[in-house]
């Protein structure tokens, strides 16, 4: 695992969090309890803060970047699928971001949402809690049932 300090900001990793050997985590990144970052991931908090909530997992080859003025927030018990790109966005608790999805600056995914594989959530788009979100550009397909 490669953990880098950037401009005096070093990642804060809970003692119960796990980072794969081939993952890279840099700058103002906070990993909560039982969070995990898998093989080949890059988490860049070099320009803004990033928070990965308790019990959340970032799967293989995903890239997460907090942009200038656009912090990246992942809630509790979130699954970020393989090869996902998250950029300066917010993901609500207990949501799932499908394989290969892209979520851009200022986008907000509510709690208990599902973003379909390969979907593109465009800049600034907001989705309410409990949404099934799919497509390019992404839109609400339906509300999920509890």
Predicted regions and their residues:
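Compact, Lys/Arg-rich rRNA/RNP-binding cores from ribosome-related proteins
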Residues: 23
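Short Gly/aromatic-enriched secondary-structure transition segments
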Residues: 34-35, 52
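N-terminal glycine-rich anion-binding loops that anchor highly charged ligand groups
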Residues: 26-32
